[in-house]
Amino acid sequence: MKIFSISKDDWSNGLAQLEKSYRLFGPVKEEEFHNFKELAKGKSPDLGYLNSRLSPKAIIYPQSEAMFEYSLDESEEDHHIMKEVDKDYSARAVIGIRPCDAKAFVLVNHNFDTPEYKDPYWIRACEATTLVGLACDAPCSSCFCTTAGCGPYHEEGLDVLLVDAADHYLAKILTEKGQKLVNAAGWDTAVDAAAAARQIETGRQEAEAKITAF
C-alpha cells in the first residue's frame, strides 16, 4: 500500500498534467446543484460538494447511446449494412467520486461482466476509466451507506482514495491504474504509510459515527 501527500498548492498543476493523457470528469456546480461533467481545460473539480444531484454513472453507462448505424442511401456501397458506431474509449479519470457511487459500479458490474455475459460497451468503458474517490467527512443527514455494505471511506471500486487533510490530500493507491494516474500527475511526495493509514482510519471512524439516520 502506498500513500502520497498532494499539496493543495500543487493540485491544479497535477490536473494540468493529467489533461495531457486523460479526459477528466468531476463535480461541477450548476446553479444550486452539483453534477459530474467533463471538465473544461484548466478547470478543477469542485471537491467542496456534498453529493451530486445525479449519479456519475452516465460517464461509464450513459442513459442512451448510439451503438449501430446504417445508411439508406442506395448510392453508397455499404447501404443497409448495420455497422458499429466508433466510440471514444481513450483514458478518462473521474476525480472526486464518492465511495458509495464507486461501489454502485461494482454492483452493476455483476450484471454486465459475468462468465455468462460480457457487455462490450460496459467493459471497454470501465477499462478506460480510473476512479479517484473522495472520502466523505461530512455525510448528509440522509446517508445510509454503512447499512448497505459501504461507508464514507469505502475503497471497493476505487483506484485511488483521496482524504482531505487540511492543506493537502492523502492519496491512497488502491490499484495499478491508480498508481499510473498519480505518476502521470507528478504527485510523488510519499508519506509514512503506517502513520497515514492511522490518520485515514481515524477519519473513517469519525465519519461513520456521523451517520445516524438509519
Which ranges hold each PLM region?
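Iron-sulfur-associated redox domains of electron-transfer enzymes in respiratory
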Residues: 1-214
